[in-house]
Amino acid sequence: MSSSAMPDIPVPLTNLKFQYTKIFINNEWHNSVSGKKFPVFNPATEEKLCEVEEGDKEDVDKAVKAARQAFQIGSPWRTMDASERGQLINKLADLIERDRLLLATMESMNGGKLFSNAYLMDLGGCIRTLRYCAGWADKIHGRTIPMDGNFFTYTRSEPIGVCGQIIPWNFPLVMLIWKIGPALSCGNTVVVKPAEQTPLTALHVASLIKEVGKMIKEAAGKSNLKRVTLELGGKSPCIVFADADLDAAVEFAHHGLFYHQGQCCIAASRLFVEESIYNEFVRKSVERAKKYVLGNPLTPGVNQGPQIDKEQYEKILDLIESGKKEGAKLECGGGPWGNKGYFIQPTVFSNVTDEMRIAKEEIFGPVQQIMKFKSLDDVIKRANNTLYGLSAGIFTKDIDKAITVSSALQSGTVWVNCYGVLSAHCPFGGFKMSGNGRELGEYGLHEYTEIKTVTIKISQKNS
């Protein structure tokens, strides 16, 4: 998108009050049964924002009981027309759009996310995803099947029931919507556990669900699930061939790693560059990383915020030290930044080899590692030599090479001459240890429905 086409970004709200800090069950706010609370912090300043009620087993039981009750045959939720269900989900999208500035400010304060990214990318994505799911609500249907014999056979797509949904801290609002949008569209009820580091936007959305005013259930809690879809971690390969548009590859690979301080499951964290362009690619990547301005993510002009918390911050610094000790060349960064908040300098390593910790472990931080390859077969083998398989990138002007490599890579998503492009229309999920099942798109709806086959004996079929 060109700068001239960028929408205006408002100024973040100041003196934000966090009024929703309780557990939301059966359209009502509750204190925890135990009386326990936990603090929620701003990772840029380390200040406490508020305290949130801490859900425990008894709270979970209450939430699941309420969600089961709402799913009973004959309940208002089960007897509601599918088109009305879609209208309610669209209404929730309207309310999120209304509160977009508030939610973006909250997401930035609680999660360390750049305000501009929260406002444009995260909130924009949430609204589009909900509207996409709303459109599916009255289009989830079965088929008639020409079974042998005098039978009439059809299938029904039925909701599976109560869905337990656990939200990660790196994209708390986006992941909440990815979970509840398709689940509710299919007619399920949900029990949601936001991440303890970033619960505030989920709790605000609960208040909007109450405002919508229908039988949609949410709560902070855990559930034992009989059926599981998991979108887990990754150590995603990004392969740059010598015939690629070098500047475009540098920029996409850079954003593929450094977006949201590297705290993305799809981060392009194993960067393979063909030998003949390796040195130039490293040079341009280092120049790009050095342009960052670090600081409070609510401040205009800042383009890198803090890591989520102290634990993650220390883990990343430890992995950076391992890279230095194991012989990778530190090109820039390599340490903490500032005297307050969990900031880490944008870091680039070259001369990285496959056996180093930084090449094998998911860092989840602003640490780019650039490796060299010589041949097509070699890089495919190395790219697939991992327990993960969430995503991958390929940069080449050769369409035959792009198709060959994308077919060979063991990844749920492969981007060619781009990286990190996601849409509500397209399925997302991983191979191997990066999870099972899919989210988004029509495939994502399948995770929230059961197929029932109904066969009726008839006197004579007329086929």
Task: Map each language-model feature to its residues.
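Hydrophobic face of amphipathic alpha-helices that form TPR/SEL1-like repeat modules
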Residues: 1-45, 70
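Residue-level signal for inorganic ion chemistry
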Residues: 46, 85, 107, 187, ...
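Glycine-rich loop-to-alpha-helix module at the N-terminal edge of alpha/beta enzyme cores
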Residues: 49-140
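Rossmann-like NAD(P) dinucleotide-binding subdomain of oxidoreductase/dehydrogenase enzymes
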Residues: 141-248, 373
